[in-house]
Amino acid sequence: MFLSCLYTNSRYAIYGYISQKSQTTSIYNKSKKTKEKVKKEEYQGDSTIVYQNPKEINISGSDTNNLIYIYLESIENTFLDTENGGIKNVNCLPELTELAKQNTNFSNTDQLGGALPFTGTTWTIASMTSQFTGLPLKVEVANDMDQQNRFMPGAKTIGDILDENGYIQELMIGSQKEFAGTDKLFLQHGFDKISDINSLKEQYLIKNDDLNQWGLKDYKLFELAKNELTELSQKGKFNFTMATIDCHMPKGFLCKYCPNTYENRYENIYACQSKLINSFIDWCKSQSWYENTTIVLVGDHPTMAQQYVNDVPSDYQRTTYNCFINSKVTTDQKKNRQFTHMDMYPTTLAAMGFNIEGNKLALGTNLFSELPTIIEKYGQDYINEEVQKSSEYLDKNIYQFN
């Protein structure tokens, strides 16, 4: 029981959350937008605003890209070699390293790096939610959103915005769509279709060797994704979102393509992921729609396979991987940033070519802009404490639990 409690706390940071929950926060209180006297196209935004309601913001774009967004299960920068920002002698993610170097990687250091772990973002459905909505998922919810009728009905998400702009949207996962309310999160916020293990079994020939205990192995998922994308791309502008699974705790899932050259099982699975993802990106590059498609790769959370991160030095900051391919905007402010998964929301839209009034959506800040993120402005400890407190605004207007 004691070990179970320790694991639960390490996964959801629930002890600190409970201690703060009796207090209330004012960070979601309506802030008056202040605009400097500059041309509209030059306005960067107000860095003092913590929360910006996306429903009150003008988001526009006439020549925006398609989107491929891939949540990478448990992919963190720790498994890079020391030369590139990890702790390993041999790089477990060589292909992903090169992709990050050749494209845009936002980093917390002057090497490759990524988003900092943050309350309400550090397990899969919470990570998806934070990147999708710019808000943390309430810790006490954990994976129980399948018990709710609606998934944050008051939130305006990436899916809602792309739906308003005529995008056809599909989520493809190798597990069951109902787990943790994944189906509700996406289908209730602009998505047209979810392809999961059950629907894929009906549509394609799936062999037993293609399966693990969660559902479809990633090599098969990427194989079938090519078919889904080919069909989707013929319908107009699209958002194709995926989530991998092979690096899931407690020890990951080996497949027939995994090498046996690294120190342990998990590192071999990591190396396999790097090759699979890179191969999929290479396929994308050969398609007619590639030049008009932004691809975003993001680790969903640091791994929970604790036995494989016991060697992490106490002074090393674990972060999740990110890479923006074919972004329509650039920035020279990519290194030594302090940001969370909530910042992926406006940053992704900006990468696609959308103009975001004030560069802030929910608790997220567009990393391509000149604005500091909320944790750069106010400090991670302060913002972390505030989001753990109760908020009548969020409960009434965003979460609206049963």
Enumerate the language-model features and the residues they cover:
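Short coil-to-helix leader/linker segments, especially the first N-terminal amphipathic alpha-helix
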Residues: S19, Q23-E56
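Solvent-exposed soluble domains appended to multi-pass membrane proteins
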Residues: D46-N402
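Transmembrane and membrane-interface helices of multi-pass
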Residues: M1-T25
